[in-house]
């Protein structure tokens, strides 16, 4: 099977990163309220599992929500929710990946979750909760196929979209070479 730092389940820390993505401005009230409600559900679920959620926010609505409730936020990104720059996206991904790969004494997390809105149509936007890291290795046709595991919303989504397939990623030349590149 594939062995890579981003595919390894961590047991050396109970800290778990939760990135909450909302809008910066108030016109999208229901949009942000739904995301904040889903993030609270995820946080509650993680705490029930004995994990320590570490909150990251993208968007002023999320930042304000947690700040108003005196809930600590590890890092916030604001001002670009309508058109995120490549630099901000790189900063978010680098921050979360380095925290996942860090040592426990340096504030590592064992998982990275994201709560965001998936756009379906102009009228329909669906809140999504996904575990992004660690990637879960699934041997379907042999070694080297990866699938993202959507921990918190998996059962709900399967009932809602019974015929939807989980996204599979096939790496060529090999998954190990791609991940080590």
Named regions from a protein language model:
Residues 1-181:
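C-terminal beta-strand-loop-alpha-helix "lid" module of Rossmann-like NAD(P)-dependent dehydrogenases
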């Amino acid at each position: 099977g594939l062995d890579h730092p981003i595919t390894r389940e961590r047991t050396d820390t109970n800290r778990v990163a939760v990135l909450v993505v909302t809008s910066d401005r108030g016109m999208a009230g229901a949009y942000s309220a739904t995301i904040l409600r889903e993030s609270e559900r995820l946080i509650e679920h993680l705490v029930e599992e004995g994990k320590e959620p570490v909150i990251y926010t993208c968007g002023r609505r999320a930042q304000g929500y947690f700040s108003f409730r005196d809930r600590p936020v590890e890092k916030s990104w604001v001002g670009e929710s309508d058109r995120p720059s490549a630099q901000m996206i790189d900063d978010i991904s680098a921050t979360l990946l380095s925290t996942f790969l860090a040592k426990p004494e340096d504030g590592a997390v064992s998982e990275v979750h994201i709560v965001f809105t998936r756009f379906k149509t102009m009228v329909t936007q669906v809140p999504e909760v996904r575990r992004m890291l660690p990637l879960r290795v699934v041997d379907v046709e042999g070694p080297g196929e990866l699938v993202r595991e959507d921990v918190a919303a998996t059962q709900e989504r399967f009932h809602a979209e019974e015929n939807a397939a989980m996204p599979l990623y096939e790496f060529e030349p090999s998954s190990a070479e791609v991940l080590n590149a």
